[in-house]
């Protein structure tokens, strides 16, 4: 099965199925000497663990096992393998579905491609695979924090005249100062849930009462809801991206769209750009292009929005097709989310970090030697 590896230099390969023995990830290309310990993973997984009223009742501890690539608390420069055992799997929940293609899922598509499929919760197509990405994101973020290239003057945002910027180009768009070591930060938040626009809601924020009530009604009806989340990446040095086919937004789009529940992405002002004049779109005190120009980071905040589809596993009766070609009416049982907005956020964070880590390494030794 192809397509399990992402990245060019900093590569991420995930493995395992939703209700198999374990899932995991192998990260290659990470430089040696990066501090990395188990606590780095557990802190992130504690935040990402489903716990709310509108989230799955499946409770995986996600206790990481570092199998290789780390010694005495630092990376070795060799492949890093991290294993996450599945301890709360219930494959029997899906036995009634083994000859049924669930609408909105990858069941039929996988069988059409491979002539067989893992019907236990979707196998590789399950959201469970995302935990392996989160683990890889932990490593990528550590690399971004500690890799010396980030702190060199070569990779800082500069004005067109080559002089260092004065710090701020617009409200919320801070450019890294020349020669400083501002850490890259990735912040993802929901800006619309169940069709209700909202002020940014982080993964740890309480829901506004209006949205909470709407989701409660949707859950009561045995249905699900979608969302729009926004990601803002601050202190990204100017110059990252590989035109023309590996532009920064192209790589970010591929990374984010590879997340199973994401169905759309827009950078900066996104589709609103179609309604703007050139003079409006080019306003230097705005960030309508989302911090990327010509496929290369320009030192402003990178901003994009991602569309999260409604969870396809719902308790309502739906028309479904069977392996024999019949159409039946069936309601899906089991442990499923009402809305994925909170659970998708750490996955987006991880994929963004992976892209930036890879792009930083792709910038090339020749550039580093000029510093």
Descriptions of predicted regions:
Residues 1-151, 155, 182-371:
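Generic N-terminal targeting/processing segments that precede catalytic cores or assembly contacts
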Residues 154-159, 177:
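Short Gly/Ser/Thr- and charged-rich N-terminal loops/segments
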């Amino acid at each position: 099965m192809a397509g399990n590896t992402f990245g060019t230099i900093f590569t991420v390969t995930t493995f395992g199925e939703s209700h198999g023995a374990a899932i995991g990830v192998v990260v290659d290309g990470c430089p040696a000497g990066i501090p990395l310990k188990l606590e780095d993973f557990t802190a992130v997984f504690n935040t990402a663990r489903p716990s709310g009223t509108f989230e799955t009742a499946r409770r995986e501890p996600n206790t990481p096992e570092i199998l290789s690539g780390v010694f005495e608390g630092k990376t070795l420069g060799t492949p890093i393998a991290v294993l996450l055992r599945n301890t709360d799997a219930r494959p029997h929940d899906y036995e009634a579905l083994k000859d049924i293609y669930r609408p909105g899922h990858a069941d039929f598509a996988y069988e059409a491609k491979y002539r067989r499929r893992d019907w236990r919760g979707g196998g590789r197509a399950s959201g469970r695979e995302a935990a392996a990405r989160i683990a890889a994101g932990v490593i990528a973020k550590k690399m971004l924090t500690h890799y010396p290239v980030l702190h060199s003057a070569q990779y800082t945002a500069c004005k067109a005249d080559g002089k260092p910027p004065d710090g701020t180009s617009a409200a919320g768009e801070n450019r890294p100062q020349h020669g400083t070591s501002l850490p890259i930060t990735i912040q993802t938040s929901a800006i619309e849930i169940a069709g209700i626009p909202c002020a940014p809601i982080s993964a740890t924020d309480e829901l506004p009462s209006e949205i909470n009530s709407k989701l409660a009604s949707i859950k009561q009806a045995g249905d699900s809801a979608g969302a729009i989340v926004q990601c803002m990446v601050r202190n990204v040095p100017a110059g990252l991206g590989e035109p023309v086919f590996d532009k920064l937004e192209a790589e970010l789009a591929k990374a984010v769209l590879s997340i199973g529940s994401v169905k759309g992405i827009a950078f900066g002002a996104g589709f609103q750009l179609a309604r703007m004049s050139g003079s409006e779109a080019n306003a230097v005190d705005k960030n309508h292009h989302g911090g990327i120009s010509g496929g290369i980071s320009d030192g402003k905040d990178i901003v994009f929005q991602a569309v999260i589809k409604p969870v396809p596993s719902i308790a309502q009766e739906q028309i479904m097709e069977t392996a024999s070609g019949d159409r039946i009416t069936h309601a899906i049982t089991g442990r499923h989310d009402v809305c994925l907005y909170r659970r998708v956020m750490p996955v987006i964070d991880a994929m963004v970090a992976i892209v930036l880590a890879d792009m930083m390494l792709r910038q090339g030794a020749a550039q580093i030697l000029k510093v």
